[in-house]
């Protein structure tokens, strides 16, 4: 813990119970997205993602080779507006991309058509507008809305071998291989039921694999030699002999091995061992007899040619039978394909048999003899059926499919995976397929089929990689450019003779690129509305990994295996945090310490172990790199020198847990918490919770609403400050220095670097609305004079307390039933919590209204609204907008607006009368913005945007003046501070140097050689200084000039900053066409805890507030303190989240120890500081490492007091996940806090004052209020809108709909026999149009409700039947039924 405090990230001390001291800091939680986007935009000065994409598309040539378009360079502009401006004005925070394009016109030789030289070169800069820019908080502002692009977890390109059960043949396994590129055609190799090897391209019809090899230019013999060992058979004295090669006989042999004399040297059915084989060779065995029965059914590897006539007797791949063998005996020797060798089968031979027929037919139809050309034509016909084909086009097509970098891209990752799997040595820059890749893949598949190869696991993290924002954007850019490339090629073909006049701009349409990118950000599945409920939800949203999205899985078709936790997730992907529901397992989160390497594979950190000794060297490994290694868990016992204590260690190897000798262990986990993600590592005692409940706990922490006053948990895990460190909500000091001035809105820090003094200014944001309508507010946590280090948190954001995440409140809880009110997880709450605003939160809602230009005139924002009472507009200002501070109730006018009525042209007389009497009211309609039914609160801000060319109203002018004044004041403050600092430095400089002449300074006279008093120097003004400085030496004068110049430069910088801010303020508002004014009103609503609100702990223990009980009626402790919350004890055993019990024990200990520290404060004896320090040291000495002891000893008295004051409200603990407090430590703590060992206490009933029969578990638990607020859900309707077709009330709160009375509810009333109620439900309360109208009329007049009519549903049914051409007539029962 101590090492964390040295960084001064937080300003709080926690008693840390870690077993292992931290080796490395937790890496920045958002670094993956930052690095990825920086790479894309070339901010790291390497070859960027943008450059790569442009170079992959350009140059573009026209078909006649007369013109070529080349990419020269690109330059990135600066954003036009700030982030805040973009959010307020509804714009996209983006930059323009300037692309330099060169168009070259070539000279051509008229006769040959060859390029001779360059005729003309034109260069032009082309602007690509609006490339969204990542904000410093790792999000994007698109149309004023903050969005996040989540990382995609997809299948890595490369080759993968699979084994699946056959869908057609029972109990048969089918083996397949796939070559997956990042871009281009997929290649599938598969066996069929008859053991023929086929290939498919892009899931088209399959062709025998040999067809593909032939299309690649291989001859029959070449293919046989590539796939089969060639065995030469010699003919001697009517015997077939072959060389003895032990490798061919390693398995059990089905025939006797005889030497050339016919003597049996090894019997059939016995295994030939290596030793025996060596002995046979030693004994001089060279030739053995090849049995004729085996030779039958073998195939020739090479054609057999008659030596005399030169005629081909038998072609290669001829199946040998007795008659053929008889003819072959005349030859001295011949070659056969040994398909009985180890690791091969007859698949290729079978494929040849299959493709022979096809080629014969093609030969006849195409009149081509070359088999390679025919194979290319066959593949072309499969890929493009029905199209005419020429052999050259077919060959070019096959070549384009896999060997053209424009069409096919394996990427660096794919090439690495291919090389690794197939043992190739192709250079990594070759990202297209090679012939060797295809051949080796087929060979390896045959090996796999014959039990020699290794089948891949597609869920292994070595076969899945992460595509982060940079790569996703590069892919989108490539798509846009590819569209543009096609358009340019089309334009090239339509160009006429005057090529000299063509400019790059005529050919390139940058809109194609922009639309593709903006489409990705607005409509892509991976670009999501940022979850901004609290800092944790924001951080975890940016660390999310999704298997969905373009090029990923489809959630309806994803099976169980993909969703399951895999052994390789250990330390890489959190096994706990994933949504409940249909996305479970498809959306994951990175583990806390995980990193992603440049190839997109997730790495986990380990410490190296050498000869049983743990070193301090930390290595990051991918799932592939850690294969086969023995890894010990972090909880392994290690002595002080780092040696592993026990001889046998429980270690992991390839996902299996085994006992390994300590010398065999190569790695050890960095720490126990590396397994889980950020949200799960915030749950104390996670190791005691059931995984399902932990999942709910981590998901619900993300829904916790920021409360009015944040307070950090008493029982934390130490992760709270890490999240605050990396969340942008907190303000962090860019550079170190001293706090010069602090107020509610700004912090000024004065510091000094190599160049000299500087002043940094930080502003606090107040009352901003987040995406989830929660309130975003910052407040300083430093005081004037504090020394601040770079990176230190100087202001808390929402849900933060002293630089720590604080998403809930510590509450005193009792596990006990309370009159049945906490039945089924309901929660009983004390009124004190509501009175003290413990769980009160502020929510901000934005309402906007536009004034448009219509054909009848312009709409006007005004207070002058027709047919509205004076008191209804009393709260509006002169401009017709609600004043700031107005209390808004449902139905009140927020902004007054009138719209012109379309009317007949008035006569001249009417116009004159109107001009005299100003009779305007009758010709406008009230179109004001009203507060909705559930909206109640206070107006906190108003933003007005006016289109250029239209007059600004008073309110807009006032707000502009106010903002300008604030900027001026801030600038003035900074200049004053600079001046003061400059004078201090100058006075300090002059007070140390002797005078060169007699001088009068202030009221004193000084002789030459004396030094002036600093107090006198401070009294004189600047003008006197300029003359006084001449009385000093040249060195001093130079130092003075340097100082003066430095401060002048700093002031110039401040002026430039100020001018830039003013310029932004004065920019014209950009509004959509037709809109002349836009008004946004922000209303803050205070939401107190109510019955129906959802609350939860951190262990998945959630519930609804069922009742709020007066404080006096709640159960109370012997000391008179009443309990805050009563929870149902039955919610614990079946849920198995015991962590909450331990948390409440430790929380109570924290409170009791805090009381003891408070007592020391209250006594205030002579040496109470000594007593305080002793008490704090006693508490800190309980954990195993006791790392805070040294820290407390080193604190000054003032610092100690600060920490002690914080502890007096409850001693704060950090119990990291999987390293929690153990039994011995708990018993020491119970003893110190003077609590019974069972953690239970006597309680008294608040209403009767009687002692409750059993002792009750009382503790302190951290409770959260979730954003499922009852105020936003309660809704009622009497009459309202109806659905057009069915005439039934619409559904949902948003549409002001009714409650659905469905099928099952109807059954309930039928079963109950409530006929009249049922009739009412199905008619006048639903879709009996006339009936409901007459019922309403009758009720308003106080008459009886008339009889009901026919529901509209009946007419819908009859009309449906009529639409099917059925004549439907309705007869009344009174009519005679003829």
Curated annotation (Swiss-Prot):
PANTHER family registered for this protein in UniProt: DNA-DIRECTED RNA POLYMERASE I SUBUNIT 2
GO cellular component, one term: DNA-directed RNA polymerase complex
Pfam families to which the protein is assigned, alphabetical: RNA_pol_Rpb2_1, RNA_pol_Rpb2_2, RNA_pol_Rpb2_3, RNA_pol_Rpb2_45, RNA_pol_Rpb2_6, RNA_pol_Rpb2_7
Source superkingdom: Bacteria
Catalysed conversion reaction: RNA(n) + a ribonucleoside 5'-triphosphate = RNA(n+1) + diphosphate
SUPFAM superfamilies xrefs: beta and beta-prime subunits of DNA dependent RNA-polymerase
Protein's name according to its UniProt entry: DNA-directed RNA polymerase subunit beta
InterPro entries recorded: DNA-dir_RNA_pol_bsu_ext_1_sf, DNA-dir_RNA_pol_bsu_external_1, DNA-dir_RNA_pol_su2, DNA-dir_RNAP_su2_dom, DNA-dir_RNAP_su2_hyb_sf, RNA_pol_bsu_bac, RNA_pol_bsu_CS, RNA_pol_bsu_protrusion
Source species: Campylobacter jejuni subsp. jejuni serotype O:23/36 (strain 81-176)
Family label: Belongs to the RNA polymerase beta chain family.
GO-annotated biological processes: DNA-templated transcription
Keyword Nucleotidyltransferase: yes
EC numbers for this chain: 2.7.7.6
Signal peptide: none
Task performed by this protein: DNA-dependent RNA polymerase catalyzes the transcription of DNA into RNA using the four ribonucleoside triphosphates as substrates.
């Amino acid at each position: 813990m101590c090492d964390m405090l040295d960084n001064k990230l937080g300003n709080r001390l926690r008693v840390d119970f870690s077993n292992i001291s931290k080796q490395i800091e937790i890496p920045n939680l958002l670094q993956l997205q930052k690095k990825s986007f920086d790479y894309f935009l070339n901010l790291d000065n390497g070859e960027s993602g943008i450059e790569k994409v442009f170079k992959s598309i350009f140059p573009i040539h026209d078909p006649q080779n007369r013109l070529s378009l080349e990419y020269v360079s690109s330059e990135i502009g600066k954003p036009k507006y700030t982030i805040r401006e973009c959010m307020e004005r509804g714009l996209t925070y983006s930059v323009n991309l300037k692309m330099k394009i060169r168009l070259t016109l070539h000279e051509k030789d008229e006769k040959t058509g060859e390029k001779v030289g360059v005729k003309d070169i034109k260069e032009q800069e082309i602007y690509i507008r609006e490339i969204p820019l990542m904000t410093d908080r790792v999000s994007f502002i698109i149309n004023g809305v903050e969005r996040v692009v989540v990382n995609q977890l997809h299948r890595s390109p490369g080759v993968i071998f699979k084994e699946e059960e056959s869908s057609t043949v029972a109990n048969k396994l089918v083996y397949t291989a796939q070559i997956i590129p990042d871009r281009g055609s997929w290649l599938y190799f598969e066996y069929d039921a008859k053991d023929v090897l086929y290939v498919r391209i892009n899931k088209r019809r399959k062709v025998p694999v040999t067809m593909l090899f032939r299309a690649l230019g291989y001859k029959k013999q070449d293919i046989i030699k590539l796939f089969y060992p060639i065995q030469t058979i010699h003919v001697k004295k009517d015997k077939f002999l072959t060389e003895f090669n032990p490798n061919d006989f390693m398995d059990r042999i089905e025939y006797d091995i005889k030497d050339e004399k016919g003597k049996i040297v090894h019997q059939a059915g016995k295994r030939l061992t290596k030793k025996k084989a060596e002995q046979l060779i030693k004994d001089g065995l060279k030739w053995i007899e090849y049995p004729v029965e085996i030779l039958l059914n073998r195939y020739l590897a090479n054609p057999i040619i008659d030596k005399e006539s030169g005629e081909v007797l038998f072609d290669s791949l001829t199946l040998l039978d007795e008659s053929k063998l008889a003819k072959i005996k005349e030859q001295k020797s011949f070659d056969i394909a040994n398909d009985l060798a180890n690791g091969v089968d007859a698949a290729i031979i079978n494929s040849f048999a299959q493709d022979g027929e096809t080629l014969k037919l093609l030969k006849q139809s195409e009149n081509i003899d070359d088999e390679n050309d025919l194979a290319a034509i066959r593949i072309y016909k499969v890929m493009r059926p029905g199209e005419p084909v020429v052999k050259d086009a077919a060959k070019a097509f096959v070549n384009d499919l896999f060997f053209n970098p424009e069409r096919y891209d394996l990427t660096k990752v794919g090439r690495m995976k291919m090389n690794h799997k197939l043992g190739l040595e192709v250079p990594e820059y070759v990202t297209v397929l090679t012939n060797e890749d295809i051949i080796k893949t087929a060979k390896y598949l045959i090996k796999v089929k014959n039990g020699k190869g290794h089948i891949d696991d597609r869920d292994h993290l070595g076969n899945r990689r992460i595509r982060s924002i940079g790569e996703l954007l590069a892919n989108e850019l490539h798509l846009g450019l590819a569209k543009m490339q096609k358009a340019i090629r089309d334009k090239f073909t339509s160009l006429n003779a005057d090529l000299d006049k063509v400019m790059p701009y005529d050919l390139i349409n940058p809109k194609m690129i922009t639309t593709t990118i903006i489409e990705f950000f607005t409509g892509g599945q991976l670009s999501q509305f940022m979850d901004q409920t609290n800092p944790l939800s924001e951080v975890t949203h940016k660390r999310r990994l999704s298997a969905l999205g373009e090029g990923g899985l489809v959630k309806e078709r994803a099976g169980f295996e993909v969703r399951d936790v895999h052994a390789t997730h250990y330390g890489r992907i959190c096994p706990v945090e994933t949504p409940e529901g249909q996305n479970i397992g498809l959306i994951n989160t990175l583990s806390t310490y995980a990193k992603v390497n440049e190839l997109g594979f997730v790495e986990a950190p380990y410490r190296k172990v050498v000869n049983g000794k743990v070193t301090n060297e930390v290595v990051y490994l991918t799932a592939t790199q850690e294969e086969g290694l023995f890894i010990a868990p972090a909880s392994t016992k290690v002595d002080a020198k780092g040696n592993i204590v026990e001889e046998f260690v429980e270690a992991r190897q390839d996902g299996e847990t085994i006992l390994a000798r300590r010398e065999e262990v190569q790695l050890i986990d960095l720490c126990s918490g590396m397994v889980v993600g950020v949200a799960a590592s915030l749950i104390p005692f996670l190791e005691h919770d059931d995984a399902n409940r932990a999942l709910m706990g981590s998901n619900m922490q993300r829904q916790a609403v920021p409360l009015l006053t944040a307070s950090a948990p008493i029982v934390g895990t130490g992760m709270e400050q890490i999240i605050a460190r990396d969340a942008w909500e907190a303000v962090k000091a860019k550079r170190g220095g001293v706090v010069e001035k602090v107020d509610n809105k700004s912090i000024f820090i004065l510091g000094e670097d190599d160049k000299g003094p500087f002043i940094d200014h930080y502003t606090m944001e107040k009352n901003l609305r987040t995406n989830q309508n929660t309130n975003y507010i910052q407040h300083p946590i430093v005081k004037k004079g504090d020394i601040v280090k770079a990176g230190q948190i100087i202001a808390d954001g929402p849900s933060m307390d002293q630089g720590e995440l604080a998403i809930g409140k510590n509450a005193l809880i009792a596990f006990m039933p309370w009159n049945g009110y906490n039945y089924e997880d309901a929660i009983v709450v004390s009124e004190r919590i509501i009175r003290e605003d413990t769980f009160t939160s502020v929510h901000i809602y934005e309402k906007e209204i536009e004034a448009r230009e219509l054909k009848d005139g312009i709409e006007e924002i005004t207070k002058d609204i027709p047919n509205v009472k004076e008191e209804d507009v009393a709260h509006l200002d002169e401009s017709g907008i609600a004043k700031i501070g107005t209390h808004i109730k449902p139905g009140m006018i927020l902004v007054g607006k009138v719209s012109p009525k379309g009317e007949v042209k008035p006569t001249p007389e009417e116009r004159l009368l109107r001009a005299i009497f100003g009779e305007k009211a009758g010709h406008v309609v009230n179109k004001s913005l009203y507060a909705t039914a559930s909206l109640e609160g206070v107006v906190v801000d108003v933003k007005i945007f006016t289109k250029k060319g239209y007059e600004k109203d008073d309110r807009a002018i006032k707000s502009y003046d106010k903002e300008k004044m604030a900027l001026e004041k801030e600038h003035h403050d900074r200049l004053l501070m600079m001046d003061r600092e400059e004078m201090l430095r100058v006075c300090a400089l002059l007070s140390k140097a002797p005078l060169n002449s007699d001088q009068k300074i202030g009221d004193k006279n000084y002789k030459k050689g004396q030094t002036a008093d600093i107090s006198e120097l401070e009294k004189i003004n600047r003008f006197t200084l300029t003359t006084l400085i001449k009385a000093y030496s040249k060195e001093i004068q130079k130092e003075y000039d340097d100082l003066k110049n430095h401060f002048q430069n700093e002031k110039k910088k401040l002026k430039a900053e100020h001018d830039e801010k003013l310029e932004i303020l004065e920019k014209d508002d950009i509004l959509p066409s037709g809109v002349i004014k836009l008004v946004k009103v922000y209303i803050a609503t205070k939401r107190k805890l109510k019955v129906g609100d959802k609350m939860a702990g951190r262990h998945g223990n959630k519930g609804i507030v069922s009742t709020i009980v007066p404080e006096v009626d709640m159960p109370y402790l012997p000391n008179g303190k009443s309990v805050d919350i009563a929870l149902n004890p039955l919610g614990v055993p079946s849920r198995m989240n015991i962590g909450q019990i331990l948390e409440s024990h430790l929380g109570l200990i924290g409170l009791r120890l805090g009381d003891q520290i408070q007592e020391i404060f209250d006594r205030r004896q002579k040496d109470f500081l000594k007593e305080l320090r002793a008490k704090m040291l006693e508490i800190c000495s309980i954990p195993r490492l006791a790392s805070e002891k040294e820290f407390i000893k080193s604190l000054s008295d003032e610092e100690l007091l600060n920490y002690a004051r914080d502890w007096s409200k409850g001693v704060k603990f950090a119990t990291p996940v999987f390293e929690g407090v153990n039994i011995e430590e708990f018993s020491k703590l119970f003893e110190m806090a003077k609590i019974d060992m069972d953690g239970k206490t006597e309680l008294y009933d608040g209403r009767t004052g009687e002692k409750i029969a059993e002792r009750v578990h009382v503790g302190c638990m951290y409770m959260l209020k979730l954003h499922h607020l009852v105020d936003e859900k309660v809704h009622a309707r009497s009459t309202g809108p109806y659905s057009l077709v069915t005439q039934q009330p619409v559904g949902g709160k948003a549409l002001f709909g009714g409650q659905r009375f469905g099928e099952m509810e109807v059954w309930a009333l039928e079963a109950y026999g409530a006929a009249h109620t049922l009739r009412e439900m199905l008619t006048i309360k639903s879709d009996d149009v006339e009936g409901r109208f007459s019922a309403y009329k009758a009720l308003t007049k106080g008459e009886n409700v008339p009889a009901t009519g026919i529901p509209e549903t009946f007419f819908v049914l009859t009309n449906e039947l009529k639409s099917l051409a059925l004549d439907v007539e309705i007869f009344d029962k009174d009519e005679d039924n003829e």
